[in-house]
């Protein structure tokens, strides 16, 4: 399992939100490229970038920062989400050196777009499912749909989606532990690998995910915990690697 540091971009700065609320943002750095360097030095093997402005505006807003990080670390897999609603945007990011694009809102509203994107950019597409009480939320979490996360995940199995980033909105940014039960249920219900997100507070939360012995969970995204120092990236990755060795 990979420990994946999150860099959330708002107005060019690295921030964290609580429960996806744009007016409840903590600025952690005015230099996201330097922040990426910090996590690379800590030994991360993948980065999770989110264009928060883009998620709300429906098109990339912090694209220059994303490109700068991708250029600085050409060998580091980077996944980007937020405002990805067209094939042109995906092409722009892929050309910039980004490894994966995360389709969120558009995946819920127009599932056929995921099929198109997977066909045009095989192996590059991740679907972001943000859920509240099992139902998928869209538009920067402003709207909760009537679509069940598990049903939508199954819908994408035939498309060749690389992974699903599953975020429990109620947990995100609150550091109260990840929704292990819902994450495991999704991983077991679908053949698509799952990346857990939202609520990870400390090494104990990583251990809980590992203890489920769910092969379908391939990573855990962490944000506020690594910025506030309750989780150490290197230590958490070492724990995951140890589990893999034991198997």
Swiss-Prot record:
GO terms for biological process: L-histidine biosynthetic process; L-tryptophan biosynthetic process. Its main location: cytoplasm. InterPro entries: Aldolase_TIM (IPR013785), His_biosynth (IPR006062), HisA_bact_arch (IPR006063), Isoase_HisA-like (IPR044524), Isoase_HisA-like_bact (IPR023016), RibuloseP-bd_barrel (IPR011060). One of its GO terms (molecular function) is 1-(5-phosphoribosyl)-5-[(5-phosphoribosylamino)methylideneamino]imidazole-4-carboxamide isomerase activity. This is 1-(5-phosphoribosyl)-5-[(5-phosphoribosylamino)methylideneamino] imidazole-4-carboxamide isomerase. GO terms for cellular component: cytoplasm. NCBIfam families: 1-(5-phosphoribosyl)-5-[(5-phosphoribosylamino)methylideneamino]imidazole-4-carboxamide isomerase (TIGR00007). It is found in: Cytoplasm. It comes from Stutzerimonas stutzeri (strain A1501). The active site is at 8 (proton acceptor), 130 (proton donor). Belongs to the HisA/HisF family. PANTHER family: 1-(5-PHOSPHORIBOSYL)-5-[(5-PHOSPHORIBOSYLAMINO)METHYLIDENEAMINO] IMIDAZOLE-4-CARBOXAMIDE ISOMERASE. Pathway: Amino-acid biosynthesis; L-histidine biosynthesis; L-histidine from 5-phospho-alpha-D-ribose 1-diphosphate: step 4/9. It catalyses: 1-(5-phospho-beta-D-ribosyl)-5-[(5-phospho-beta-D-ribosylamino)methylideneamino]imidazole-4-carboxamide = 5-[(5-phospho-1-deoxy-D-ribulos-1-ylimino)methylamino]-1-(5-phospho-beta-D-ribosyl)imidazole-4-carboxamide. The keyword Amino-acid biosynthesis applies.
